[in-house]
Amino acid sequence: MLKLGIFMMPIHPANKNLVDCLEEDRNLVIKADKLNYSEAWMGEHYSSSGEPVPSPFIFNASLISETKQIKFGTGVISLPQQHPAIVAGHAA
């Protein structure tokens, strides 16, 4: 059986409201779950206001209660930005 997944590349206009950006990204994952996508991946993005996801762990955790079957993954964790023990704690 074919399984579909989505990698979130959350590029938004730099002047767009942060809350609106995150809500748009969350709605996309919720829609993917309803369409029976099997997984959703989100990377960590500190580099620009157009990619407003500093913690894929928190972003993914915020979707657990609103999805039924989709699995979550982190596409990128920038270890130079954080202490490895903090990353390990978030991932546990």
Each language-model region and where it sits:
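N-terminal beta1-alpha1-beta2 module of alpha/beta enzyme domains
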Residues: 1-74
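Glycine-rich anion/phosphate-binding loops
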Residues: 20-23, 80-92
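Conserved strand-turn element in the central/C-terminal portion of the radical SAM core barrel
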Residues: 73-81
